[in-house]
């Protein structure tokens, strides 16, 4: 707001965002008169096709720890400096997974809301430099962080929305490179089965046969770009101009 107050009243303002969450959009609207919204591509959020997605359906959530250990051993994670970003759902879970990995002998750090800003920055820089090639994070790291050369994203616990899933796996396969994402899916996540299957099919990724046991109904959203809790914050909608990717 302070920066905006420094601009002359009749200035022409362009605002850009990779995503357009309601809070940011509402703030932007307070600065604008008769705005025009320009969308490049589709409003439907889709997964990066350069990311190879693997979904493991587990009968019991308690199997996650064993499967994580098995996967890290299979890629020889202790002997390489490949960056592996592991997502947990809650702060306490993230800390527990981090402690477990450290006990197994891995160089690991974490990012979540219980850490100070200083510690979060230090842990992020250690991950960037691969001095600690494993990072356990909550969804605080799912958006906005551009960390180069992340080889794997592991969804230890499925997120609360399919949008968060797409943003999580988007931390790999950046800058034109390919990436890999592994997701543990349990009965507790069955409400997301239909949306996850859609994302996998749209990206031409394999759908595990075990997903057949889950309901595939996709609940209607109020807005495809902004997720389940989108709410129009201003009474007048802007004009919308949409360009296809080929334009």
What is each model feature region?
Residues 229, 235-238:
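Intrinsically disordered, low-complexity, serine/threonine- and charge-rich segments
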Residues 1-5, 9-223, 240-247:
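Conserved helicase RecA-like core
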């Amino acid at each position: 707001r302070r920066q905006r107050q420094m601009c002359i009243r009749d200035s022409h303002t362009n605002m850009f965002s990779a995503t357009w969450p309601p809070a940011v959009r509402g703030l932007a609207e307070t600065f604008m008169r008769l705005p025009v919204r320009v969308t490049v591509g589709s409003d439907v959020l889709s997964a990066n096709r350069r990311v190879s997605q693997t979904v493991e359906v587990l009968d019991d959530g308690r199997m996650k720890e064993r499967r994580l250990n098995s996967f890290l051993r299979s890629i020889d994670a202790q002997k390489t400096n490949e960056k592996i970003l592991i997502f947990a759902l809650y702060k306490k879970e993230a800390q527990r997974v981090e402690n477990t990995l450290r006990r197994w002998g891995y160089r690991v750090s974490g990012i979540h809301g219980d850490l100070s800003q200083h510690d979060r920055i230090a842990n992020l820089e250690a991950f960037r430099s691969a001095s600690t090639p494993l990072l356990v994070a909550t969804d605080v790291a799912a958006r906005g962080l551009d960390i180069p050369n992340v080889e794997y994203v592991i969804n230890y616990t499925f997120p609360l929305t399919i949008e968060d899933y797409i943003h999580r796996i988007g931390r790999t396969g950046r800058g034109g490179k390919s990436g890999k994402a592994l997701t543990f899916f349990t009965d507790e996540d069955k409400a997301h089965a239909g949306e996850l299957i859609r994302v996998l099919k749209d990206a031409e990724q394999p759908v595990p046969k075990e997903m057949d046991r889950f309901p595939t109904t996709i609940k209607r959203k109020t807005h495809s770009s902004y997720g389940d809790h989108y709410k129009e914050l201003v009474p007048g909608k802007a004009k919308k101009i949409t360009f296809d990717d080929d334009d």
